[in-house]
């Protein structure tokens, strides 16, 4: 966003429950977090965020949710959010749907591509939502609602440094999975192999989102 010279502010809702006025915003990006959308008693800000998202969608604001952010948008649209059949941590092959191949955010993506994931929950496709990226066994990897609301289960925003930071901070993920279907070594190999193309596509995706009017 700095490269695009797009003015922005970053809010950490765990530290502050201050929400900006929607009239002051042109685009909204909801990032991930370690909490789940249904843990509202433990994280009370999630209730207020749900109302914020609903109003943003009703007013046609351009909104992009990533991982937890996608699940929050799905929930705001009355779709069910629940445990995925498997935890996806690391690099996974995804595919564009017919809708996805025509979508402005993904028009420069190949039909199949590798993406970085870190999630244990998934969501049903909202009513009137369009699935634009899919995979197996977690089919709802990205959706669009209307013209301006997007939810992405994968992480186009990550950096190599952030991947290493997550593996350090959430080390227990690699100890509790029985049997393990991912490892730090596999993730590092995937990052080495995929990073140049993936980081470029991530920049394109965010740039395309910021270009929505």
Q: Where in the sequence are the language-model features?
A:
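C-terminal and late-domain segments of enzyme folds
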Residues: 133, 138-146, 151-213
């Amino acid at each position: 966003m700095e490269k695009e010279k797009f003015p922005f502010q970053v809010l950490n809702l765990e530290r502050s429950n201050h929400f900006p006025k929607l009239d002051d915003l042109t685009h909204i990006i909801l990032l991930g977090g370690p909490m789940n959308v249904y843990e509202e008693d433990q994280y009370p800000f999630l209730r207020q965020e749900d109302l914020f998202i609903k109003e943003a969608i009703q007013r046609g604001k351009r909104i992009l949710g990533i991982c937890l952010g996608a699940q929050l948008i799905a929930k705001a649209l009355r779709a069910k959010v629940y445990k995925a059949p498997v935890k996806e941590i690391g690099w996974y092959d995804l595919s564009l749907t017919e809708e996805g191949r025509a979508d402005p955010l993904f028009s420069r993506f190949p039909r199949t591509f590798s993406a970085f994931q870190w999630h244990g929950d998934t969501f049903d496709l909202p009513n009137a939502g369009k699935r634009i990226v899919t995979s197996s066994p977690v089919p709802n990897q990205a959706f669009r609602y209307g013209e301006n609301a997007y939810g992405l289960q994968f992480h186009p925003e990550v950096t190599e440094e952030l991947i290493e930071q997550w593996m350090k901070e959430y080390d227990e993920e690699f100890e509790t999975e029985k049997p393990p279907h991912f490892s730090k070594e596999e993730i590092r190999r995937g990052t080495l192999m995929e990073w140049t193309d993936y980081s470029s596509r991530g920049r394109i995706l965010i740039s395309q989102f910021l270009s929505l009017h």
